[in-house]
Amino acid sequence: MSIEDIGSEQAYVSALYDRLDELRRRTTTRLRGVLRQHESLPRARFERDAASADCAATLARIRAAENGLCFGRLDFDDGERRYIGRLGIFDEAADYEPLLIDWRTPAARPFYAATGAVRLGVRRRRHIATRRRDVTGLEDDVFETGSRAPGAAPGSTPAELVGEPALFATLNAARTGRMSDIVATIQTEQDRIIRSDHRGVLVVQGGPGTGKTAVALHRAAYLLYTHRDRLARSGVLVVGPHQAFLRYIENVLPSLGETSVVSATVEVLYPGVTVRRAEEPAVAELKGRAGLADVIAAAVRDRQRLPVGQTFEIHTEERLLLLERSTCARARALARESGELHNDARAIFVRAVIDALARQVADGYAAETITAQVLEADPAAFDLLAPAGSGGTSLLDDDDLAQLRQELRADPAVQAALAELWPILSPDQLVAELYADPGTLAAAAPRLTAAERRLLHRPLAEDDPDPDDDWLRELRAATAPTAAGDTGAGVGAAGETAGADAPAPDGARPRPRPMGGWTAADIPLLDEAAELLGDDDQAARAAALRERVARVAYAQGVLDILSRDIEDDPEIMMATDLIDATRLADRHEDADLRTVAERALADRTWTFGHVVVDEAQELSEMAWRMVMRRCPTRSMTIVGDVAQTSDPAGTTSWERVLAPYPAVGAPARRETLTVNYRTPAEIMAVAADVLATLRPPQQPPRSVREVGERPWRLRVDAADLGAQVGQAVLAELARLAPGPVGSPTAGGSGGGRLAVLVPAGRIAELTAAVRAVVPTAESGPGAALTATVVVLGVREAKGLEFDTVLIADPDTLLTESARGAHDLYVALTRSTRTLGVLHTADVPPMLARLSPADAPRTRPAPPGDASAAAPGPTTDSDPAAGTAPASTSPTASSAPGT
């Protein structure tokens, strides 16, 4: 590209940045003016804070557009020219003529959709590369001509790939541990999915490296732009497989100017409970079955009990009450027929029982009074009296009966009886006690085998404290006795509105939990229980009560100060004559200014306007029930690959996932991503052999590039596996970047990252072996994004990618779980360039395409293919020493295949 072209584009880009700076100055000035406003009325404060939030969001979008503001240009046959970028910029002096078009608008679509076969009126598409605010390069796609880009695999043509030079430049950068946006290199099949209708469920099936995650995130940004009024209120939820994955993608949406999306794993969607341990695969599979929903429902009904005998004796301090089984049966039927959730329906049950007991006591009063009057007149008439309590005219009026019902409701013996027959339950209590009691399990789960029920059985935790019980300490602190004249009146009023059935603070107790704590597989069961019980709101009430106590106390202090100097003068009206502390506090109650994301994560019942589920094949049937509740409109984007399912409770069929959920608004539809941008063709050929063994059969994605390097295998002695892995790491790390091996600079910035993927049972052992030669090596998902060398289990690497991958002990990977072949397929496809496999037995037949380590690893570069491995030393490894061969080659970076 000529210097004149670059200079011309630089002038235009500089003008765009000048306009961006002006927008930033205007918004900053407006924000300062808003923040200087001092409003006293709640409504005015709310409007001020809303304006402030709007300015802050605008500034965030401006900051996000700073890097790569303008990345493309379209020249049309009719002479029209459009510049494409991260946000829209307009010329106010020219009737708001667009200077830069937001990539999400319909006007920008030809930038991604135009091909040599379907030009859409586009004559030339220009990709503009920038560094900070400087134009560094231009690449043109002229649709009348074109040639395959260097490094493209055979079969790729300009009609299939958009902007090949820009795309391959992106692919050939080293991985950084964070995913970046692909807004400048979105491909045609990806763009079609990103812009598809928001209504209904969209399933995107795509093999490794096809860009499922990138498509899902850019679709979220597109929908927020297109339907902002609706989605800004309800929010967009992105569900990922694990926290390391969420950290991996966390910069993508902010870089696109979107900061209001909620990103969470399934277990985070149930607030207040922390996962403490991993679940055994067999137990996780069992807990993930849809049939467990029936078990939870049966457990709830089992806690709505009737007396064992015909009567239930209640010994109060004053009398013996007899509660008949038939009375309880009528009360239970009435409560169940109401359709209310368990804890809400309890009020109906309690009311019916209390009414029956009150009538019994009233009849007893009447009988006692009549008996006393008759015997006083004629003692010989005792045998003629009807049995006490058999009925008669009540001597109590309505007010007396109301008072009697209140007394019965407050009586400890009556409360204990009601708690036994129809207790207030939290989801934690219901599920933990279900696990702990074999008899309850047998009654609730008759369709499970005895062996399956034993898998679910887990004793209750007794003494180990749980950090999640901080709410209990807050509740007790908030309701501790205060000095006379404090906030008793206001707090008392709040307490009365809770109803007599609400548990007293002194009766609150830590939430039951299984021994060892909850697992990720328990979370959907807790959510299911919450749907049937109603939320346990003790923690929320504790926080609200604590806040109210503080607010009323502060208001009382203000009134005391205002009245201090004039309280002895009866002729002067004081503030306390007009308002009390409670009303003053209520007038200054703050509006809820939390963001949509903050409110959504704190509210289990929140429903989202759109939900994106990534690595969706890993969700169990119970987890799907949980996710579907968050989006009753079924506006969802589901992305995954059923060939990569690792979770024992995951799915291998999208049809099976969606079958229980009727379509809402629009039928479910399916798209397939077919192009692999991450995995080189040499590695994908090996992975395709593994894919061929899986059921149901899947078509492997087509890789767009070759790297000129064959994936290798090395057989080692089982006893020497750790040492051989360490030597292989040293050899491969030396190829990533210069610097002393094991130093922070080895494989550092610009060099790329290396992962050793191992069986779950050998992580500790092989991590120690790698650290023996590379002290800076890390292990576990917490280090998966930051360490140059990291040792991971396959499931910890799901959704991530690395420049170099070494797989240790594939035989154990294949046998340690029921989905071992799926795990091996995932492991093989994490690499963007180099793959090595170290095995201790005969190589599995499905890995037969791997080249022996003592064979040359690079192939001659085809004529004109500059991206193939550069000439250089290709040292063969010594199988006895276990050293992998060394060669020089470039690495790869985040691109459309992430």
Question: Residues of each region from the PLM?
Answer:
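Hydrophobic alpha-helical scaffolding
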Residues: 157, 172, 235, 239, ...
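Conserved helicase motor core of SF1/SF2 NTP-dependent helicases
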Residues: 229, 234, 243, 247-287, ...
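ATP-hydrolysis module of ASCE/P-loop NTPase motor domains
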Residues: 279-368
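Extended, charged low-complexity regulatory segments
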Residues: 1-192, 583, 859, 866-873, ...
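Intrinsically disordered or highly flexible coil/loop and linker segments, enriched in small
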Residues: 22, 26-33, 144, 258, ...
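Conserved helicase NTPase catalytic core signature
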Residues: 327-610, 623
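P-loop NTPase Walker
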Residues: 2-38, 42, 131, 150, ...
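Intrinsically disordered, low-complexity terminal tails and inter-domain linkers enriched
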Residues: 480-509, 738-750, 862-897
